[in-house]
Amino acid sequence: MNKTFIGMGHSPDGIDIPLGLSMELVMRPQAAATFGQMSSTEKHAAIRYVQSGSTGEEAKRRIRNAIQQMENGHTAIS
């Protein structure tokens, strides 16, 4: 069973994925597969990376960058 939680409500893993990132993960199966293989620490780091954008445009750019890295199999997102 896939343990990756993408959606609304309480995440059983304690990780709340930003809506924009979750939407991209749903549309990008390879990125979602990589995200599912990431450790909890790596997932938290990726989410912090996305959320640390100072503007909405910066957050969108960070989401695109994170998705591209995950599509390439990278789990250390920066």
Residues covered by each model-derived region:
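Charge-dense, helix-prone N-terminal extensions
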Residues: M1-S78
